[in-house]
């Protein structure tokens, strides 16, 4: 369910059944991981690991949270908007990513990201966050130094973008990813309207795409990946 409250309740059920047989807790995101950590694992000193490197989880490493994985959200957010910026400017897609732009923005392939030509996709690379390095990740909304330079508006003029987040209640998306997007949009001269979905229905998002003609570009985060036609049918009109 990816739901923190459900995870907190689940650990109570599991401990009632298994008690001290539980040696480690591993969660697919920090929202659920922190819920189980606070509800039971912290007091019982059971190592708990999550995913996303949310600020509260990173801070909790000092209190016994076992660790988490940074999705390099600062790179993810930059790549999302940078690909749009390059398309709008009509420049090579790799500009400011693997190839320096005029402002000096450039990522390191193999360290920060990888590119799949076959899939035509950029992927931010994960980083383990542990007791040894967690202090480097305490601000999850800080832009990445390598790509923090302002673009020249005479070469990259202001453009308007419609961007949705499929679930506004998701801890990572709302507390880390969207704030990072908002920190990058000004650097890339993009005026972005952010739309938060309910995580359940596509119509909760598409109903707020009433006038696509006023936008220069779109970044779509679908609830279900087989629902692309819900958006293309609107954008093709």
Please name every model-derived segment.
Residues 1-12, 26-32, 52-55, 71-77, ...:
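Hinge/beta->alpha junction and helix N-cap segments in small-molecule ligand-binding domains
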Residues 152-171, 175-237:
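Alpha-helical recognition/docking segments in bacterial nutrient-uptake
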Residues 79, 83-159:
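Hinge/cleft segment of the Venus flytrap/periplasmic-binding protein
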Residues 2-59, 181, 218, 223-236:
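Hydrophobic alpha-helical
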Residues 23-27, 38-110, 131:
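Exported/periplasmic ABC-transporter solute-binding proteins
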Residues 58, 135-140, 170-175:
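Short, solvent-exposed loop/turn elements at domain surfaces
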Residues 21, 64, 213-216:
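Short loop/turn motifs at secondary-structure junctions
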């Amino acid at each position: 369910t990816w739901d923190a409250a459900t995870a907190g309740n689940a650990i109570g059920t599991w401990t009632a059944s298994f008690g001290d047989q539980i040696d480690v807790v591993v969660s697919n995101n920090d929202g659920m991981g922190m819920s189980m950590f606070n509800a039971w694992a912290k007091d019982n000193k059971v190592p708990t690991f999550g995913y996303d490197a949310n600020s509260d989880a990173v801070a909790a490493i000092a209190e016994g949270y076992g660790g988490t994985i940074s999705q390099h959200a600062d790179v993810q957010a930059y790549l999302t908007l940078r690909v749009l910026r390059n398309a709008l400017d009509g420049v090579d897609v790799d500009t400011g990513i693997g190839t320096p732009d005029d402002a000096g923005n450039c990522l390191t392939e193999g360290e920060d990201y990888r590119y799949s030509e076959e899939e035509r996709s950029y992927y931010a690379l994960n980083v383990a966050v542990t007791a040894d390095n967690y202090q480097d990740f305490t601000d999850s909304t800080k832009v990445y130094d390598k790509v923090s330079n302002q673009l020249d508006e005479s070469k990259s003029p202001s453009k308007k973008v419609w961007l949705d987040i499929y679930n506004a209640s998701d801890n990572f998306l709302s507390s880390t990813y969207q704030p990072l997007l908002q920190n990058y949009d000004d650097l890339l001269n993009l005026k972005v309207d952010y739309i938060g979905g309910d995580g359940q229905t596509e119509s909760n998002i598409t109903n707020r795409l009433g006038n696509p003609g006023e936008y220069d570009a779109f970044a779509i985060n679908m609830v279900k990946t087989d629902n692309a036609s819900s958006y293309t049918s609107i954008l093709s009109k």
